[in-house]
Regions:
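N-terminal ligand-binding/catalytic initiation module
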Residues: 1-144
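Hydrophobic, well-ordered beta-alpha structural blocks that scaffold small-molecule cofactor pockets
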Residues: 134-171
Length: 171
């Protein structure tokens, strides 16, 4: 698949293909927009059936992050990255370390975080070689679950709908 003619390319600013044969790394970083600030979006580790499937996913997800960050009023653009691997792989940490060097090479143009297959502990591994990582386990108290943020976001969305429909936010 030619990246520029891919249906989901949609004028992405950057698409970086990451490869490190010493650990078997295949990954993609997609930066959709930096108009509002550095691109931000999670790092997904998933055993995609093909590079084309991974490319389609990362392009769609990074564009979605542009809209998500803008709608949340954040000074962030949209980006996303994928590592084509099974998160239960015995060399998972080596893959994360190798991949993080590619994120670091962007110098803050893209910030990554947790996503499918990459949790806060894995974010700590990414942060060993990269300063542009959100949601690291080391940033939270012992036992804290980042799913609390997901739940809060869902609740705030319900409140916003309630305010719009019924002019009430007390649920």
């Amino acid at each position: 698949m030619c990246v520029f003619s891919a249906t989901d390319f949609d004028a992405h600013e950057d698409v970086l293909f990451c490869h490190d044969p010493s650990v078997g790394l295949l990954g993609i970083i997609a930066i959709h927009s930096t108009k509002l600030g550095p691109a931000a979006g999670g790092c997904r580790m998933y055993p995609y059936p093909s590079v084309d499937a991974a490319l389609t996913d990362v392009l769609r997800l990074s564009k979605g992050m542009s809209y998500k960050n803008a709608m949340a009023g954040l000074p962030l653009g949209g980006g996303k990255c994928v590592i084509i691997a099974d998160p239960s792989s015995p060399n998972r940490d080596e893959l994360l370390r190798a991949f993080s060097k590619h994120v670091q090479s962007l110098g803050g143009k893209y910030w990554t975080a947790i996503d499918v297959g990459v949790g806060p502990k894995e974010a700590d591994v990414l942060a060993e070689n990269c300063e542009y990582v959100f949601a690291r386990a080391s940033q939270y108290p012992e036992g804290f679950s980042v799913s609390n943020f997901t739940a809060l976001g869902g609740f705030m969305g319900i409140r916003a709908v309630s305010k719009h429909l019924w002019d009430k936010t007390d649920l």
